[in-house]
Amino acid sequence: MIRVNDLNESLKFYCDALGMKLLRKHDYPNGEFTLAFVGYEDEDSHTVVELTHNWGTKSYDQGSAFGHLAVGVDDLYATCAALKEKGVKVVREPGPMKFGGPHIAFVEDPTGYKVELIQTNTVHS
């Protein structure tokens, strides 16, 4: 679960930019929060991301314990170019990892969380 500043902007990022689907969303008026679940496939058998928006909260201290989310992509360079066209902030340009390994890039969601993009055909087993 990640807490987001603006649920609509976050849904645009995860769904419109990264291509996830909004799987379900529910408002909890008594608790003054909304939960939205996004992912690439059905949540019964695939990983999903829970976005929590606490009504009236403008920002969060992200701390230092959480690093980032990671998503595999088929064409890292084309994906980054397309995300830039959509206004997504690329904070680490695509290229090989330091000291060898897969090709990666990092983008930033509207709340400031980092999402690592990993070119799947460069991952070594």
Locations of regions flagged by a protein language model:
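Core segments of cupin and vicinal oxygen chelate
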Residues: 1-46
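N-terminal beta-strand motif that seeds the catalytic metal site of vicinal oxygen chelate
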Residues: 1-11, 21, 66-71, 118-125
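A general structural signal for stabilizing positions within well-ordered secondary structure
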Residues: 14, 60, 106-109
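Vicinal oxygen chelate
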Residues: 23-27, 34-37, 71-125
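Short, charged/polar surface micro-motifs in flexible loops or helix N-caps
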Residues: 42-45, 56-58, 76
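Short, charged/polar, Gly/Pro-enriched secondary-structure boundary elements
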Residues: 43-47, 112-115
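Short glycine-enriched loop/turn motifs at secondary-structure junctions
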Residues: 61-66, 98-99
